[in-house]
């Protein structure tokens, strides 16, 4: 250490305090990185890795750097790669420093604590989440530092906690260090493998310590005053988040003004599998927004509205009155398209007020941010005027909550120029006429620059040197440049400052005097402008709560306008949401598939479910016929109705439900991987259980290839059979996509295999095997013959459904239900039996 330069020792001392972060070490106009940080950063950023002067021991110091005024995209790339970045600034003016400049880390940027737009997706929240537990009670809290949103809840059991965690989708997670070792809780780390994880020691979760953190952040607030007195474990998780803020942001987050507690019973519950299968916010195959329910429904024009819509989809309501209020607002905007379009046009010019407010409160906002705030606030009176014409209760309530902040808008309009520069220290931010001292300094600067122009003309005339130039650089200030060919013509009062290959540079006493006057004024202008800008930014920060409330109201208006436009354009109906049990949908459509541009017209279907004769619907039919689509569309229509949205149907009566479960697709087949007999047995028992459990009386759509299950309608009064209508033509099938009463008589496996593109030779052989099986062609020992050969009469009658023979091949073939075979299963069966013979 003693052999290192003073600056390198300073770097290592500060780096030791932040070993898990890449240290951005401010050196003049650059952030520099050294040693391992430089090696890692240069690789991630794709920038040149060089080295500083060798240490006293002869070793080189790896080095890379980025300009401080354009560091945002570099930081964003590092954070996206999962790295933490510690910003180390110069804590004093280098000109005034005695010895090495003092430096200190002002903040640590982590994946869950970014606030700059370069690191954020406009319509996605960026959550930091903390999870802890006491026995089976799990406390969960999450914060979006960019918007100030801070929520807490408690959940019963690990699976419920994991379901909520996956719904929230945090960028970074805080866990107790004990979660590293406890086998049960290692599941958490497996679920969040693509997230940045920080582990805290157990002392961070001390209740008294967490209470102090809460009181410090929220101006003496208690658990009771925050509404968290019945959520003690969630409050510990909140304490962990606040501890992280203190550690990384020096505890400076004034726009985080409160905690919003919530209970999972306030919303329709959706587990992770249901969210995934229904493709609520991302597609199942590619994980993309486009093609999901969110992708379809999002016609919002603000980033705030986009985030709010996602929350509404993830957390459908359980309160009928709130649902009706949303429906009333959507209906009024549907019936007043002029108001809706005018409102959307005005909202489209509103910037992301939530994130602007976050950066302003964190003293990270630029002059561009204040200009965006001014532009947004200037639209509020017109928005309020449009909404004031509406009579729906929710629209009136939202409009009353929009605060125009006239005085703040006026302040920014007077203080900040229309198109301010990006770099604060370059000046040109404050408008003329805002500050008298600044105006006077600018006059001096302009006069001085005019003098320079006049002096250049004067010197050209005095010397006769037409190529004479007066120029400026940061090293020498103002100087007179004369080419070598004209040096003999210079006057005696010229003082040489620098010799170049082709020119000489001079100053004169008069030039030096004016330089001091002009440059002194320009330095003072920049300092004063920055000071005035900070005053305006602080004035805006003081209105943070008002800005946040207004932003939330605007986001809700944006969502309501979006849902209204969607319902109008797609011909959706207003569902009748009620507390009864009947679910009745007339001409219902899958919202996403109905929106796809396809050569095949979407076929709507009716649905009737209740707690009486239509509690459980068994749906049979071939693969690719539309069973999964039908089930998904019923679930999505129910979910959309409880969002308060209109739904894709001609008419809909939707009961309030507390949970939706879906297991749809090949990977979620009930009894997948079992023998046919086992599968039928399990499916039969599950259907009986769902029907007979009157405590929950779950309304159920049960799609199956087990045709035996259609017999349940005979033994259970609440079970009905339906199938997907199919027409056969010329050995081919046409899917009619219509749900009709009764069970399916065939599975059409071979026809589906043809549609799936299997080779014709395979299709023909499968047909031959199927004929042999259906006609009962047997070989020696009474085994059904799959190979080509003569037919031998069967030696004994077929065993019962759940019987089994002793012979391996006989037993295997007795299990085969031909009508249920998928193309792939048929091929696998052929291969299996060939190996057994």
Swiss-Prot record:
Superkingdom of this protein's organism: Bacteria
Keyword Secreted: no
Coiled-coil regions listed: none
GO biological process, one term: mismatch repair
Keyword list, A-Z: ATP-binding, DNA damage, DNA repair, DNA-binding, Nucleotide-binding
Binding, ATP: 621-628
One GO molecular-function entry: mismatched DNA binding
GO cellular component: cytosol
SUPFAM superfamilies the record matches: DNA repair protein MutS, domain I, DNA repair protein MutS, domain II, DNA repair protein MutS, domain III, P-loop containing nucleoside triphosphate hydrolases
InterPro entries linked: DNA_mismatch_repair_MutS, DNA_mismatch_repair_MutS-lik_N, DNA_mismatch_repair_MutS/MSH, DNA_mismatch_repair_MutS_C, DNA_mismatch_repair_MutS_clamp, DNA_mismatch_repair_MutS_core, DNA_mismatch_repair_MutS_N, DNA_mismatch_repair_MutS_sf
Entry-linked Gene3D superfamilies: 1.10.1420.10, DNA repair protein MutS, domain I (3.40.1170.10), MutS, connector domain (3.30.420.110), P-loop containing nucleotide triphosphate hydrolases (3.40.50.300)
Family statement: Belongs to the DNA mismatch repair MutS family.
Function of the protein: This protein is involved in the repair of mismatches in DNA. It is possible that it carries out the mismatch recognition step. This protein has a weak ATPase activity.
NCBIfam families: mutS1, PRK05399.1
The protein, known as: DNA mismatch repair protein MutS
């Amino acid at each position: 250490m003693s052999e290192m330069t003073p600056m390198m020792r300073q770097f290592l001392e500060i780096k030791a305090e932040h070993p898990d972060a890449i240290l951005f070490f401010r050196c003049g106009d650059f952030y520099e990185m050294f040693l391992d940080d430089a090696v890692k950063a240069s690789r991630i950023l794709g920038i040149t890795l060089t080295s500083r002067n060798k240490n006293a021991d002869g070793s080189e110091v790896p080095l890379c750097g980025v300009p401080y005024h354009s560091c945002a995209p570099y930081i964003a790339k590092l954070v996206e790669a999962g790295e933490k970045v510690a910003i180390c600034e110069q804590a004093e003016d280098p000109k005034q420093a005695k010895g090495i400049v003092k430096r200190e880390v002002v903040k640590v940027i982590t994946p869950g604590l970014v606030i700059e737009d370069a690191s954020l997706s406009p319509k996605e929240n960026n959550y930091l989440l903390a999870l802890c537990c006491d026995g089976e009670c799990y406390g969960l809290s999450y914060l979006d530092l960019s918007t100030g949103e801070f929520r807490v809840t408690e959940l019963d059991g690990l699976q419920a906690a994991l379901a909520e965690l996956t719904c929230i989708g945090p960028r970074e997670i805080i866990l107790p260090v004990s979660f590293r070792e406890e086998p049960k809780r290692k599941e958490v780390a497996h679920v969040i493998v693509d997230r940045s994880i920080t582990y805290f020691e157990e002392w961070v979760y001390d209740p008294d310590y967490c209470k102090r953190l809460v009181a410090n952040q929220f101006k003496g607030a208690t658990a009771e005053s925050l509404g968290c007195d019945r959520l003690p474990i969630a409050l510990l998780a909140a304490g962990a988040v606040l501890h992280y803020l203190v550690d990384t942001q020096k505890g400076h987050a004034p726009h985080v003004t409160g905690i919003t507690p919530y209970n999972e019973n306030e919303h329709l519950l959706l587990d992770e599998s249901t969210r995934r299968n229904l493709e609520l916010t991302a597609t199942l195959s590619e994980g993309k927004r486009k093609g999901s329910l969110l992708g379809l429904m999002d016609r919002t024009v603000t980033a705030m509205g986009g985030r709010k819509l996602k929350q509404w989809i993830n957390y459908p309501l359980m309160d009928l009155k709130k649902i009706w209020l949303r429906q009333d607002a959507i209906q009024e905007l549907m019936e007043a398209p002029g108001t809706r379009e005018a409102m959307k046009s005005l909202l489209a010019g509103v910037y992301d007020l939530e994130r602007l407010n976050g950066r302003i409160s964190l003293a990270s906002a630029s002059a561009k941010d204040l200009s965006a705030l001014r532009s947004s606030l200037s639209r509020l009176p017109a928005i309020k005027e449009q909404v004031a014409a509406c009579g729906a209760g929710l629209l009136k309530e939202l409009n009353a909550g929009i605060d125009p902040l006239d005085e703040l808008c006026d302040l920014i309009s007077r203080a900040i120029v229309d198109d301010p520069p990006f770099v604060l220290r370059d000046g040109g931010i404050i408008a003329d006429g805002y500050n008298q001292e600044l105006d006077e300094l600018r006059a001096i600067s302009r006069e001085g620059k005019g003098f320079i122009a006049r002096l250049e003309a004067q010197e050209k005339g005095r010397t006769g040197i037409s190529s004479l130039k007066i120029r400026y650089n940061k090293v020498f200030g103002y100087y007179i440049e004369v080419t070598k060919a004209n040096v003999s013509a210079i006057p005696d009062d010229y003082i040489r400052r620098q010799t170049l290959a082709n020119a000489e540079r001079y100053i004169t006493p008069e030039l030096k005097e004016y330089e001091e006057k002009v440059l002194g004024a320009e330095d003072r202008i920049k300092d004063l402008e920055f000071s005035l800008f900070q005053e305006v930014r602080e004035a805006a920060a003081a209105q943070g709560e008002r800005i946040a409330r207004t932003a939330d109201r605007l986001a809700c208006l944006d969502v309501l306008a979006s849902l209204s436009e969607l319902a109008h354009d797609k011909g959706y109906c207003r569902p009748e949401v009620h507390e009864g049990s009947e679910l009745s949908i007339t001409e219902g459509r899958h919202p996403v598939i109905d929106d796809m541009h396809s050569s095949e017209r979407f076929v709507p279907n009716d649905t009737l479910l209740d707690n009486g004769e239509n509690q459980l619907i068994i749906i049979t039919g071939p693969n690719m016929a539309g069973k999964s689509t039908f089930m998904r569309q019923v679930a999505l229509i129910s979910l959309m109705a409880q969002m308060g949205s209109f739904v894709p149907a001609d008419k809909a009566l939707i009961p309030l439900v507390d949970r939706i479960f879906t297991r749809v697709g090949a990977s979620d087949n009930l009894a997948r991987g079992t023998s046919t007999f086992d599968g039928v047995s399990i499916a039969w028992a599950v259907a009986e259980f769902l029907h007979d459990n009157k405590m929950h009386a779950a309304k159920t759509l049960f799609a199956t290839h087990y045709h035996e299950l259609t017999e349940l309608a005979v033994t259970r009064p609440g079970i009905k059979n339906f199938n997907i209508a199919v027409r056969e033509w010329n050995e081919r099938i046409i899917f009619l996509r219509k749900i009709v009463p009764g069970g399916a008589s065939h599975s059409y496996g071979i026809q589906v295999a043809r549609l799936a593109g299997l080779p014709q030779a395979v299709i023909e052989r499968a047909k031959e095997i199927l004929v042999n099986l259906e006609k009962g062609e047997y070989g020696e020992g009474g085994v059904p013959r799959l190979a080509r050969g003569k037919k031998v009469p069967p030696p004994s009658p077929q065993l019962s459904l759940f019987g089994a023979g002793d012979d391996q091949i006989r037993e295997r073939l007795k299990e085969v239900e031909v009508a249920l075979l998928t193309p792939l299963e048929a091929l696998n069966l052929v291969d299996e039996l060939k190996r057994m013979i």
